[in-house]
Design a protein with these regions (language model features):
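Extended, hydrophobic alpha-helical segments in both membrane/secreted and soluble proteins
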Residues: 1-13, 17-20, 47, 148-165, ...
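Structural signature of the thiamine diphosphate
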Residues: 48, 55-136, 186
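A general structural signal for short secondary-structure junctions and capping/turn motifs
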Residues: 8-13, 49-53, 108-114, 155, ...
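Short beta-alpha connecting loops at secondary-structure transitions
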Residues: 27-39, 71-73, 77-81, 88-93, ...
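Glycine-rich phosphate/ribose-binding loops and adjacent secondary-structure elements
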Residues: 2-3, 8-9, 132-134, 139-145
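Short coil/turn connectors at secondary-structure junctions
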Residues: 12-18, 24, 54-58, 114-117, ...
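Iron-sulfur cluster-binding cysteine motifs and their immediate structural context
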Residues: 123-125, 129-136, 154-193
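Thiamine diphosphate
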Residues: 1-33, 37-45, 105-106
Length: 193
């Protein structure tokens, strides 16, 4: 499961490649464990420092919450690392840029032009885990809900194509096929807007 060896080998071989690391706040298969709880755990910043130390040429973070990284770049005191205090590594390494997920396509295109091994860390909580936490009252439900008015919908399907969201579903009406948002599967991330 560890991709670190593959990244290390790509760097050693001088391969032009971009790795995408999904940091989704959940451990797959075994279910529901959080990641990065402990100081020696694997936060995005700690992963970024490890990759930078391995020799990754360019490293970026793409997230739906770029504001949580505001002020967390370029501040690492390397003496804290040498002194054996990995818990102090909570800032991103120098040169790591943070982008909103809306810029994912552009960032991927830029990274594929960079010579050497590059890494894109995508930081967003798993949508299924978010829905589970909302259902259990552990995560606040957003105040806004997206609804498609079937009486106004022209049935063109552009909203499905543009958002690429599975919750935008076709519905047959007396006026033909229209679209609606399935609220039970909606992640409330507003990617369809």
């Amino acid at each position: 499961h560890s991709g670190l060896l593959a990244i290390r080998q790509s760097i050693a071989a001088g391969v032009n490649i971009t790795y995408k690391i999904l940091y989704n706040d959940a451990v797959a298969m075994t279910g529901g464990q959080q990641v990065g709880e402990r100081p020696e755990g694997h936060s995005v910043a700690q992963i970024a420092h490890s990759l930078r130390a391995e020799g990754v040429v360019k490293l970026v973070v793409v997230t739906d919450e770029p504001e949580k990284y505001h002020g967390r770049t370029h501040r690492l005191d390397s003496s804290a690392v040498r002194a054996g205090h990995p818990e102090l590594i909570n800032d991103l390494p120098p040169g790591v840029e943070v982008f909103h997920r809306d810029e994912l396509d552009r960032i991927q295109r830029e990274l594929r032009e960079v010579k050497g091994c590059t890494v894109l860390i995508y930081d967003q909580t798993c949508a299924t885990e978010k829905r589970r936490r909302r259902k259990r009252g552990k995560l606040a439900t957003p105040d806004k809900t997206v609804i498609i008015n079937e009486l106004v919908c022209e049935g063109c399907g552009d909203c499905s194509v543009k958002s690429n969201c599975l919750s935008v579903e076709p519905v047959e009406t007396e006026f033909g096929r229209k679209r609606r948002i399935n609220q039970s599967t909606c992640n409330k991330d507003y990617s369809c807007v």
